[in-house]
């Protein structure tokens, strides 16, 4: 049946999928999860599952007692585990007559615009066909500098790409806390978060399992990416996938991150979160106000420092005088050129560079602000 209720992206992590001691799969979690997602599909939702677990399952299959750290070994183990993982999903979903598809992505699929657009078209077609795509990072071929590092970021980028209505992050705690509830009995639960709301939490204290790569800090970063795209994000207990329908019905389960009232355009989301910055520009206070409060382009006169080695067209971080990142943009000049014209007036640029360049270092159409 056609999806009429919007798209739901569900991400389940290694800590929820596998036993922390042995790395073996928890069928007590997988079975109910498959049933819930199939039911949502029959109720008119388009569903995408982002599933970790390939490395953990590969470790269990090969008798490894801890996650490998060497890149080549980790990629080999992922290749072993991914086949077993998707086979199990196919067996479980097939029992309910629900077709699935395996979609393996790398960061390069988001960095290169043509691949990004093509991946989006593939997701759209699969969802129109009533298929549940099961997504994971392609660990076997991903190079270190183009890795997501965790599936929280991947799930947020997928949710943004397909303009999902919901992103459900299933984890090993029932909601976000001010500190790790496993270690700190005074940890306070946080039920709702709005964009721009200051969070007094020790994100790193939530940690992560020995088999996974994510922690609570990565989930907060994922929430920032997804909510900027207008996606509602919920962090909740991965051992209770049966609660997902209640969450979609509006019940206060887990921690809910409210979406931006005015979602950022697809192109600017791609600039802000899809691309990998190759350097950074430090701006003076006047330039920060101009781009953040007045929506203006960045002029060379407002740049005080240039870091990195990049060419024109590269993505860079835009930082305030204190080093806080306020945005990202595509530069009109190389790093070497920007070092020569930083702090200079526009009229001086042709004399410094020896040719007539553009007025802006980063045009506002190629500039995306961050919270």
UniProtKB/Swiss-Prot annotation:
Involved pathway(s): Amino-acid biosynthesis; L-proline biosynthesis; L-glutamate 5-semialdehyde from L-glutamate: step 1/2
Gene3D superfamilies: Acetylglutamate kinase-like, PUA domain
InterPro entries: AceGlu_kinase-like_sf, Asp/Glu/Uridylate_kinase, G5K_ProB, Glu/AcGlu_kinase, Glu_5kinase, Glu_5kinase/COase_Synthase, Glutamate_5-kinase_CS, PUA
Domain (PUA): residue spans on this chain: 278-356
Source organism, top-level taxon: Bacteria
Single Gene Ontology MF annotation: ATP binding
A GO cellular-component term linked to this record: cytosol
Known catalytic reactions: L-glutamate + ATP = L-glutamyl 5-phosphate + ADP
PROSITE patterns per record: GLUTAMATE_5_KINASE, PUA
Coiled coil: none
Locations listed in the record: Cytoplasm
Swiss-Prot/TrEMBL keywords: Amino-acid biosynthesis, ATP-binding, Cytoplasm, Kinase, Nucleotide-binding, Proline biosynthesis, Transferase
Binding, substrate: 52, 139, 151
Broad class of enzyme this protein falls into: transferase
Any one biological process term the GO annotation gives: L-proline biosynthetic process
Function: Catalyzes the transfer of a phosphate group to glutamate to form L-glutamate 5-phosphate.
PANTHER family xref list: GLUTAMATE 5-KINASE (PTHR43654:SF3)
Designated name of the protein: Glutamate 5-kinase
Native organism: Synechococcus sp. (strain JA-3-3Ab)
Gene of this entry: proB
């Amino acid at each position: 049946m056609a999806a009429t209720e919007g798209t739901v992206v569900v991400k389940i992590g290694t800590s929820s999928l596998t036993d922390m001691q042995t790395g073996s799969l928890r069928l007590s979690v997988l079975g109910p999860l498959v049933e819930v997602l199939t039911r949502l599909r029959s109720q008119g939702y388009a569903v995408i599952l982002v599933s970790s677990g390939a490395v953990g399952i590969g470790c269990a299959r090969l008798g490894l007692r801890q996650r490998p750290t060497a890149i080549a070994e980790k990629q080999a183990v992922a290749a072993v585990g991914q086949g077993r993982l998707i086979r199990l999903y196919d067996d479980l979903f097939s029992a309910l007559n629900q077709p699935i598809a395996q979609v393996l992505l790398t960061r390069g699929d988001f960095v290169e615009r043509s691949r990004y657009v093509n991946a989006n078209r593939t997701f759209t077609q699969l969802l129109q066909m009533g298929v549940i795509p099961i997504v994971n990072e392609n660990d076997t071929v991903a190079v270190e500098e183009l890795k997501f590092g965790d599936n929280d970021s991947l799930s947020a980028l997928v949710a943004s790409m397909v303009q999902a209505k919901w992103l459900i992050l299933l984890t090993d705690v029932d909601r976000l806390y001010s500190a790790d509830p496993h270690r700190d009995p005074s940890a306070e639960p946080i039920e709702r978060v709005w964009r721009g709301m200051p969070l007094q939490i020790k994100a790193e204290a939530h940690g992560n399992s020995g088999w996974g790569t994510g922690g609570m800090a990565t989930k907060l970063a994922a929430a920032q990416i997804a909510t900027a795209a207008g996606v509602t994000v919920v962090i909740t207990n991965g051992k209770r996938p049966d609660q997902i329908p209640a969450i979609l019905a509006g019940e206060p389960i887990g921690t809910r991150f409210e979406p931006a009232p005015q979602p950022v355009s697809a192109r600017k989301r791609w600039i802000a979160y899809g691309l990998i910055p190759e350097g950074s520009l430090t701006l003076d206070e006047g330039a920060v106000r101009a781009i953040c409060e007045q929506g203006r382009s960045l002029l060379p006169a407002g740049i005080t420092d240039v870091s990195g080695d990049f060419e024109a067209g590269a993505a860079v971080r835009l930082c305030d005088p204190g080093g806080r990142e306020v945005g990202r943009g595509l530069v009109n000049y190389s790093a070497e050129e920007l070092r020569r014209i930083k702090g200079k007036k526009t009229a001086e640029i042709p004399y410094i560079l020896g040719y007539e360049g553009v007025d802006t270092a980063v045009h506002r159409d190629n500039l995306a602000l961050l919270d």
